[in-house]
């Protein structure tokens, strides 16, 4: 892969004579506008790199450090499993390399880091409790729920995660192409209930590796299409298995 002012281009396509500006053929076509807008002012800035990270199944575009208070470090990541783009935020990388299937990167303070496990800022000689939770943010694709043209109101939602460690999450339904990133929330130490002693209406029933989150009763909101904005943090590797949603359809717009 080659990264240029035209975006991300396959070497194979270039050898076949495909024009680099044909963004629809690029694996980064969905974020080409983001890449190009940054290239306009940062093309000559050191810090651009492209690599495949097989262990995580992602294609990574590292971008230069920016002098700003938010998203100072922002790297673009394509997940081969979901065929979706996302960001790595606050990974203070100025240069990256692969060694034995692991990413190593250097920061502006002269430190070298590597990516492993489910926590951040873990020291080499780690005590029993070390590191900080990794934060994440997600906005699902908007959907009409199989009822295009009809307004609808979501009553309750419930995300289901599978993994190990502690998890804390905050989530909300958005309507008609709103964009809102929710505030962060602390970790939730709640685990599964004990069968013979827990009360049915108050207990959370989970598997050994499933983190259960209570159903959230939602407030206002109505629209034709819906999406879920979710933000949280965890101390271990987590997989979002599904988001269960119950909604009421209304009349035609």
Q: What positions do the PLM features span?
A:
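Beta-sheet repeat architectures centered on beta-propellers
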Residues: 4-253
């Amino acid at each position: 892969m080659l990264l240029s002012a035209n975006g991300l281009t396959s070497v194979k396509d270039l050898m076949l004579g495909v024009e680099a500006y044909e963004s629809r053929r690029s694996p980064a076509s969905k974020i080409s506008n983001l890449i190009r807008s940054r290239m306009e002012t940062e093309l000559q800035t050191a810090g651009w790199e492209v690599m495949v990270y097989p262990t995580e199944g992602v294609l990574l575009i590292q971008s230069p450090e920016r002098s700003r208070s938010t998203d100072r470090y922002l790297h673009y990541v394509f997940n081969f499993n979901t065929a979706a783009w996302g960001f790595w935020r606050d990974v203070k990388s100025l240069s990256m390399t692969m060694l034995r299937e692991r990413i190593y990167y250097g920061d502006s303070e002269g430190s070298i880091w590597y990516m492993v496990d489910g926590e951040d800022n873990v020291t080499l000689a780690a005590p029993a409790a070390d590191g900080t939770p990794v934060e994440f943010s997600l906005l699902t694709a908007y959907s009409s729920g199989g009822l295009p043209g009809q307004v609808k109101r979501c009553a309750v939602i419930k995300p289901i995660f599978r993994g190990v460690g502690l998890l804390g999450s905050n989530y909300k339904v958005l309507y008609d192409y709103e964009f809102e990133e929710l505030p962060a929330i602390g970790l939730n130490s709640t685990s599964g209930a004990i069968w013979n002693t827990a009360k049915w209406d108050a207990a959370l029933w989970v598997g050994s590796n499933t983190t259960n989150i209570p159903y959230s009763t939602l407030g206002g909101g109505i629209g034709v299409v819906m999406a879920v904005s979710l933000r949280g943090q965890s101390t271990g590797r987590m997989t979002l298995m599904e988001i269960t949603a119950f909604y009421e359809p209304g009349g035609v717009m």
